[in-house]
Amino acid sequence: MTCKNTRRLYQIITTFLRYGIDEIIPDIPLTRHARLGRKALFWVRNQHKDQPFGVRLRLALQELGPVWIKLGQMLSTRRDLFEPELAEQLALLQDSVEPFDGKSARQIIEQALGGSLETWFDEFDEQALASASIAQVHTAKFNQNQPLVGKDVVIKVIRPDIEPIIKADIALMYRLASWVPRLSNDARRLRATEVVREYEKTLLDELDLTREMANAIRLRNNFENSEMLYVPEMYPDFCHKNVIVMERIYGIPVSDVETLKANGTDMKLLAERGVQVFFTQVFRDSFFHADMHAGNIFVNPNHPENPQYIGIDCGIVGTLNQNDKRYLAESFVAFFNRDYRRVALMHVESCWTPADTDIDAFEQAFREVCEPIFAKPLSEISFGHVLLNLFNVAREFNMEVQPQLVLLQKTLLYIEGLGRQVYPQLDLWQTAKPFLQNWLNEQVGVKAILRDLKQRAPQFREHFAEFPEAVFNALQQQKQINFRLDELNKTLQAQGRQKSHNVRSIVSGVIILGVLWRFDDLPLWLSCGTLVTVLLVLLLQRKS
C-alpha cells in the first residue's frame, strides 16, 4: 500500500471513529485484537454520542466524500441487508457537490470533440446546470453549422481526475470489507465484499458515458412514439467516453407535486403509468432504467390530461433473462394467491437455492414471513417489499445473490415511492396484475406454442431430412428389441404371463431411453418426434 493510500485509510478509520461507527464491533473474543488495536493506534472518541447510529453513519459518509456518499445511496436500497431506520437515513445522502471550473469543462469537451466548441455550438454556459460526484452538465445550442441549428442541448462531462480517486477508494473499501466477516455471523451475512464488487461495477460503468449513450438510445427506441415515456435524443457523433451531448428537455420534476397539480395533471393516470412503464420495461423489453429516483424523472408539461414521463440519466440499467422474468411473474402471482410452496419451488427450480433444500421448511419460512403482510388491503401491499421479504427468506436458505434482481427490487421501490407520492391511493396490484397475467399466458398458452414453432422453423427445415432416417433406425432397433424380448419371454412363460409383460415394459423403457440417448445431438423436437413414433409402433404391435 502506498503512503498516499495509507494516509487515506487512516483518514477513513478516524472519521468512522469520530462518529462512533466502531460500536458495531461486537465485544467477543474473536474481535479482541481489533478492539485493542483501535485503542492503541487511534486515540479518537465518539464526538456525536447524542445522535442515533444511522444519523452518525450518514454524516460520516457525507464527510468522506462523493465515492462514499454514492456507496451510502446504494446501500440505502439494500433493505435486505439493513434495518429500515438505517436505510432511511442513508437515503437522505445527497449526491450533490460543488461544480468544477467551467473553463476546465470547456477544455475537456474540446479535447474530446477535437476542436473549438464554437465549431459546433453557440451559447455554451460555463456555469454548470447541475453537478454530481461523477459528472456535471452544461447547456448550449447547435449553431448554424449543424443540421439541428438552434436546438437546445445538454453536454455532460466527467469530472477530471475522478477515476484514480474512485479506484483508490474502492481498493480501500475492499480492504475494509475483508475485515467485516470476522466480526460476527450477522456481519458475515452482509457479504461486504460482494457489495463492494457490485458498487465498483456500477461506478466504473458510470465513468464510461458511451454506455449511457447506448442505454439511452435503446430505451428511446423501446418507447418510440409512446404516450407513457419520452427519452431525450442522443447525438452519437458528439459522444465519447468522458463527454456526451443530448437533447435538452423541459419538464416538471416528478417530486414537485404541487406544480403538477397546478398544471392540471391527471395524478391517478400519472401514478398508474409509472407502474406500467416499469413493468413494460421488465416483461416486454427485458431491459429497464435502474436509477429511476426523483432527480431523473420529469413530467411533460404539455397535455397534462394525458401525462407523459421523461426519463434521463441512463447510466445504470438492468437486464433480465427469461428465467428471471418467469421467477418474478410466478412468484408475485403465487404470493398473492398465498401459494408459498410454489414460491419455494420457484427458488429451487431457478437454481438459486441448492437442489437439496428442504422444501417443507422453505415453504414454512415463506409463510411465517409473508402471511402477516396480508393484514393490509391488497391495494396497500408493496411489490418492492414483497420481493425484499422473498430475498430475506431465501438468503437464510443459501440463495445466491442475484444482482439483476437486487437492482430491480431497488428500482421497484423507487417507482412505488414516486407513484404513491403522486397519488397516495395507487393500487399497485390492480395496475401490475394485467402485465403479470398476460406475460404468463404468452409463455404457456397456444400463442407461446405457435410462436415457438415459428421461431424454430429454420431448424425444422434444416433437420427435417434427418427425421425419416431417425425413425427408420429406431424401428430397426425396435425389431431387434422385439426379437430379444420374444426369446426372453419364452424362458419366462413358466413364471406367469404378468411377469413377462412387466419385463417387456421395463426393458422397452430402458431401450427407449437408449434410443433417445443415441439421438441426443438432434434437436429436441426431432428426438421427441422419434420417441412418439416408437411409442406408436409399440402400441400397435401390442394390439396386434
Swiss-Prot record:
Q: In which pathway does it act?
A: Cofactor biosynthesis; ubiquinone biosynthesis [regulation]
- Boundaries of every Protein kinase domain copy: 123-505
Q: Does the keyword Transmembrane apply?
A: yes
Alphabetized GO MF terms:
ATP binding; protein kinase activity
Membrane topology, from the record = Single-pass membrane protein
The UniProt entry's coiled-coil ranges are none
The record's keywords, sorted A to Z, are: ATP-binding, Cell inner membrane, Cell membrane, Kinase, Membrane, Nucleotide-binding, Transferase, Transmembrane, Transmembrane helix, Ubiquinone biosynthesis
- Segments crossing the lipid bilayer: 522-540
Asked if the record carries the keyword Membrane, the reply is yes
Q: What is its EC number?
A: 2.7.-.-
Which InterPro entries would you find in this protein's record?
ABC1_dom, Kinase-like_dom_sf, UbiB, UbiB_bact, UbiB_kinase
Residues reported in the UniProt entry to bind ATP: L129, A130, S131, A132, S133, I134, A135, Q136, V137, K156
The catalytic residues are D291
The Gene Ontology biological process annotation of the record reads: regulation of ubiquinone biosynthetic process; ubiquinone biosynthetic process
Described function: Is probably a protein kinase regulator of UbiI activity which is involved in aerobic coenzyme Q (ubiquinone) biosynthesis.
| Database matches in PANTHER family | CHAPERONE-ACTIVITY OF BC1 COMPLEX CABC1 -RELATED, PROTEIN ACTIVITY OF BC1 COMPLEX KINASE 7, CHLOROPLASTIC
Q: Know the name of this protein?
A: Probable protein kinase UbiB
Q: Name the species this protein comes from.
A: Actinobacillus pleuropneumoniae serotype 3 (strain JL03)
